[in-house]
């Protein structure tokens, strides 16, 4: 049986990682995957990102150079985030004419990718691809996959759209209609299972909990210590820096010197954040909490902020916060391939995610799979992943002092850090390994293909996270 996995965005976030690992494991469960996805130069090249898979890239190179990237041929995707001067403006600012242009383009992309011959179309996010699939191949059943950013935009619209979101109402209506037309909706957390039916006005029976996971062959305990650890951070910070300044967005405009690597000597504990520079991630809060905690550390413990797609940020840039606080030992190595992430995690000791609206928390389970205890916010996805006090730390949202206290305990109590890391390793492997998760997604496809009622695919009892 054939499934077409469709992703409008070029690969830079969690949804692309999900598609890559899911596709790699679907063949073992009777489904042959094809991926159609946006593509951009460099790290966002879909052909390279989905290497080894049947991928049909939609090249956005020309669109990125156009006066209006969304009116190019082919057009670039819009965004669920409203970032000033970004080429992909927020969906809620996209007018009807541009919307129709996007739909028409994706009708063609889906046809060329073989959508009409697929048994299932797996649509990531709620985008004009959904409308295109309905128009181009209405008889092929659709499975939707919500990754969280679309829900955040819908929440903003419901609370009162920001200025300039002149088409917010139309987009909210479209997204609800697209969700309702899917046979099933995969969501990342029990919290989303509870919230999505009301938010999108869909039958609760079609909403299925499908957490993200990790590849156990890639993410495992292979700790880098001593010279090997320093060597990796030398490569990422000194020899091949990719950090960038808000006023100079070329990769490498933030770099470091050999003497800066003293922070990583003597197997000092390393605190690692991984992700984009978006406002909900609360990187400025993390840096300020670290500045508050650092004087109470019993040993040097550098904070590494890994990520930040070049030129993309919301609110304060991390470098601006570092300069404003004057804090030392905070490092910005920039954006690196997901293929490098396991090495980075194994050269660290704690993974930290201060995000206040994280629908899942992909990097948490990847870090846990490498034996790192996580520190995260007690809300949404992280609250279902982490057992506070056993395999990590959970802190209240937007609580700088609580975040600082968790950092201090993680740094100063090595025995407790290792105990929680051991537990994190075991719990991640028991719950979030991709081979097992892909089997569950394949069973959803099987049910949809067989025409089973929604209630037969609905999740069982969900954990109580209130």
Predicted regions: what they are:
Residues 307, 315-339:
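Nucleotide-activated donor-binding/catalytic signature segment of Leloir-type glycosyltransferases, i.e.
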Residues 356:
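Aromatic "clamp/platform" in nucleotide-sugar-dependent glycosyltransferases that forms part
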Residues 164-185:
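Membrane-proximal helix-turn-helix segments that form the acceptor-binding/catalytic region
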Residues 4, 186, 227-281, 287-290, ...:
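Conserved donor-binding/catalytic core segment of Leloir-type glycosyltransferases
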Residues 34-116:
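A conserved catalytic-core segment of Leloir-type glycosyltransferases
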Residues 388-389, 393-400, 409-414:
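Conserved acidic donor-binding segment of nucleotide-sugar-dependent glycosyltransferases
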Residues 191, 213:
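Carbohydrate-associated surface elements
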Residues 373-376:
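Short hydrophobic beta-strand element within catalytic cores of glycosyltransferases
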């Amino acid at each position: 049986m054939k499934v077409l996995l469709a992703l409008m965005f070029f690969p830079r976030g969690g949804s692309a990682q999900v598609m890559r690992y899911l596709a790699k494991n679907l063949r073992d469960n009777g489904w042959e995957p094809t991926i159609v996805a946006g593509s951009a130069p460099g790290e966002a090249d879909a052909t390279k990102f989905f290497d080894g898979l049947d991928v049909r890239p939609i090249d956005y190179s020309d669109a990125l150079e156009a006066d209006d990237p969304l009116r190019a041929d082919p057009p670039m995707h819009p965004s669920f985030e409203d970032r000033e001067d970004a080429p992909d403006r927020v969906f809620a600012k996209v007018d009807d004419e541009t919307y129709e242009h996007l739909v028409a383009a994706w009708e063609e992309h889906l046809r060329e990718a073989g959508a009409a011959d697929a048994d299932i179309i797996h649509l990531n996010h709620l985008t004009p691809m959904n409308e295109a699939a309905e128009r181009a191949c209405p008889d092929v059943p659709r499975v939707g996959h919500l990754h969280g950013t679309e829900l955040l935009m819908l929440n903003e619209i419901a609370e009162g759209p920001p200025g300039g979101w002149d088409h917010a109402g139309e987009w909210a209506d479209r997204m609800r209609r697209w969700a309702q037309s899917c046979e099933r909706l995969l969501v990342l957390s029990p919290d989303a299972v509870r919230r999505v039916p009301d938010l999108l006005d869909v039958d609760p029976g079609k909403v299925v909990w499908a957490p993200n996971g990790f590849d156990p062959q890639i993410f495992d305990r292979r700790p880098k210590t001593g010279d090997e650890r320093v060597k990796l951070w030398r490569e990422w910070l000194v020899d091949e820096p990719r950090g960038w300044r808000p006023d100079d967005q070329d990769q490498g405009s933030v770099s470091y010197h050999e003497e800066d690597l003293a922070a990583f000597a003597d197997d000092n504990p390393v605190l690692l954040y991984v992700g984009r520079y978006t406002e909900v991630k609360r990187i400025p809060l993390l840096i300020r909490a670290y500045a508050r905690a650092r004087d109470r550390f019993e040993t040097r413990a550098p904070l590494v902020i890994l990520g930040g797609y070049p030129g993309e940020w919301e609110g304060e840039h991390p470098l601006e916060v570092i300069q404003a606080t004057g804090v030392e030992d905070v490092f910005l190595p920039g954006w690196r391939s997901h293929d490098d992430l396991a090495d980075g995690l194994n050269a660290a000791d704690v993974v930290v995610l201060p995000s206040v609206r994280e629908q899942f928390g992909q990097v948490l389970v990847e870090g846990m799979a490498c034996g790192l205890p996580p520190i995260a916010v007690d809300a949404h996805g992280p609250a279902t992943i982490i057992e506070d006090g056993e395999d990590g730390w959970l802190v209240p949202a937007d609580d700088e002092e609580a975040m600082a206290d968790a950092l201090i305990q993680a740094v100063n109590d090595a025995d407790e850090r290792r105990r929680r890391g051991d537990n994190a390793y075991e719990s991640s492997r028991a719950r979030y390994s991709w081979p097992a998760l892909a089997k569950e997604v394949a069973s959803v496809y099987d049910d949809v293909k067989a025409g089973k009622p929604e209630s037969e695919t609905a999740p069982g009892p969900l954990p109580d996270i209130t």
